[in-house]
Amino acid sequence: MSDKVINPQVAWAQRSSTTDPERNYVLITVSIADCDAPELTIKPSYIELKAQSKPHVGDENVHHYQLHIDLYKEIIPEKTMHKVANGQHYFLKLYKKDLESEYWPRLTKEKVKYPYIKTDFDKWVDEDEQDEVEAEGNDAAQGMDFSQMMGGAGGAGGAGGMDFSQMMGGAGGAGSPDMAQLQQLLAQSGGNLDMGDFKENDEEDEEEEIEPEVKA
């Protein structure tokens, strides 16, 4: 087993708005191969992620990852959304506390250039081009299915607000529900629906969903 703690690679982009809180956010992609047992701590002024990689053929060591970022400005922890996709990338969407048109000049509070933090140019748009890009339908969150992300730093009780249409397969939403996603959302929300009423007819390759432990 490897005892070395590794800083994972981070890519980030952002949007800003003076009037719309939903368009005032930071997107972070953390790269951790074979991500396992993630533990996320979200505070207004910082985020911290701990995880490990599972052993596999050719590398039987367990690698430990840790990321701590003191953010340039405060965020709203309870609105944070996060998800592990394919066991390779940890996606986070952080909502900025202050509504303002100016971009953050950097992700971190410290004016230090960290070698493992990069700009995500695939999602980056200049401040004066935000409205134009959005009008063209080019979302900053391309490739991230935020409808299936886990929200908040502490979780919310009840099944209210769950969009079950997002879990339906087939044309026009007429297919069978995605049982793994349904069970995951119910587990997060404390729902008590009778799963016996649902039958899965089609087997599809799905993203590996790993529910992190989140600390408020």
Curated annotation (Swiss-Prot):
Function comment: Acts as a co-chaperone.
Family: Belongs to the p23/wos2 family.
Protein name as it appears in the record: Co-chaperone protein SBA1
Top-rank taxon: Eukaryota
Molecular function GO terms recorded: Hsp90 protein binding; protein-folding chaperone binding
Residue ranges with Acidic residues bias: 200-216
Region annotation (Disordered) ranges: 169-216
GO BP annotations listed: chaperone-mediated protein complex assembly; positive regulation of telomere maintenance via telomerase; protein folding
Assembly and binders: Interacts with HSP82.
Any one GO CC term of the record: nucleus
Span of domain CS: 5-108
Residues the record lists as N-acetylserine modifications: 2
Sequence repeat start and end residues: 141-156, 160-174
